[in-house]
A protein has these predicted regions:
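Short intrinsically disordered terminal tails
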Residues: 1, 228-234
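Collagenous Gly-X-Y triple-helix signature in extracellular proteins
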Residues: 1-196, 200, 204, 225
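Intrinsic low-complexity, intrinsically disordered segments enriched in polar/basic residues
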Residues: 124-127, 216, 230-232
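Generic L/I/V-rich hydrophobic alpha-helical segments across diverse proteins
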Residues: 195, 213-216, 220-223
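N-terminal regions of proteins, emphasizing targeting and processing segments when present
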Residues: 198-199, 220, 230
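Charged, low-complexity interaction regions
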Residues: 203-212
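N-terminal processing/targeting junctions
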Residues: 212, 226-229
């Protein structure tokens, strides 16, 4: 089924540029933050053991050969957008500033904000956030994610971790979503609507579990139908 990326729920998996991506979040600027479904293993943060993502070998590779391959796979105009990445260190130091990128490793803040919809993988992978900065005596250690989803830090030269590229895509991009690759798409606003309708339906009294489940199923069906109609008119 084809639909606009901006209508896809957080956690939706979809193919683009010969890769599979996970929808993390939509922003008001018409962009969607996406994360590669799988890790590219055995890639250091930086071959020279520097924890500043702006000058790292991983940034150069992701925005060089890797991005070139993605664009070639699209075979036409692409939806990858440049962004200004905040390189504030994990301890709050802002020595490393920002950098302009198209493909990047998630920051710690982006990871934490979207941890609930990021699938676990068997490999460790880098984030773009430094543990601290060179001026504070920490020029080598960068943050990374364990296979269980917890955060840790490693020396930037280590190939023990891999890369899990992220990007911003134009939210108007039409994507294909297979059955089972999208969750219900119910956010806080939709959830509030469901609760309000349930209260009205049952007069503020407690329903049985079966009644509640049946009513929620019906309302979710209505929401899906509305979303599909909206996508069809994009």
């Amino acid at each position: 089924m084809k639909k606009a990326l901006k209508t896809a729920a957080r956690g939706t998996v979809f193919p683009y540029a010969a890769e599979k991506w996970v929808v993390l979040e939509h922003d008001p600027a018409g962009r969607t933050l996406c994360l590669r479904l799988e890790v590219i293993p055995d890639k250091p943060f930086d071959e020279d053991n520097r924890n500043n993502f702006a000058i790292s070998s991983s940034k150069e590779w992701m925005n060089g050969p890797y991005l070139d391959n993605l664009i070639d796979a699209v075979k036409g105009p692409h939806a990858f957008l440049q962004t200004e990445l905040d390189l504030t260190a994990d301890d709050g130091l802002k020595d490393y500033g920002t950098c302009t990128v198209t493909i990047f490793s998630l920051t710690v803040d982006q990871y934490r904000r979207n941890r609930d919809v990021i699938p676990l993988v068997d490999d460790w992978y880098w984030l773009s956030t430094a543990y601290s900065t060179a001026a504070n005596g920490y020029e080598h250690s960068a943050r990374c994610v364990w296979d269980v989803g917890a955060l840790t830090g490693l020396g930037a030269y280590r190939g023990l971790s891999g890369l899990r590229p992220a990007c911003y895509l134009d939210s108007d991009l039409l994507i294909s979503v297979e059955d089972g690759d999208e969750d219900t798409g119910v956010g806080p606003q939709e959830a509030g609507t469901i609760v309000a309708e349930l209260v009205e339906q049952f007069g503020g009294t407690y329903a049985t579990g079966e009644q509640f489940a049946a009513e929620v199923s019906f309302l979710l069906g209505k929401l899906r139908a509305i979303r599909e109609k909206e996508a069809a008119h994009e």
